[in-house]
């Protein structure tokens, strides 16, 4: 099954739409992202054609950006967060999915960053980039992020299940 093609080329440069199962969905600009606490991460990706490539990125944690949009978790149930997926879309249509548990400090604690600087250079309207430290190759590196969608896994479990 081929993935659906998503045309994100019309999205405004330097703007990220936060959508899905959020209490406060919104569009956030690069300037807004700069006001959040920053994190520096160094990554090394094994590229098929050019070998290992190393970069340093700086920007807010994806977790902090999404917490500000108030994901629709059940606050009384600590593990409820583990049902949520985070899908990230780049301007070129490239997509990557992370689990909330992967980036949550109580579980996987992966410091995924929305990078605003790469190797000391401001990405400006070519940012942010999703950067996932620890990934062996750069498949989940998403350039020019235009949308981040948080979704509970309910639809996945409802699909193709026998009706009772």
Where are these regions (language model features)?
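N-terminal intrinsically disordered, low-complexity segments enriched in P/E/S/T
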Residues: 1-164
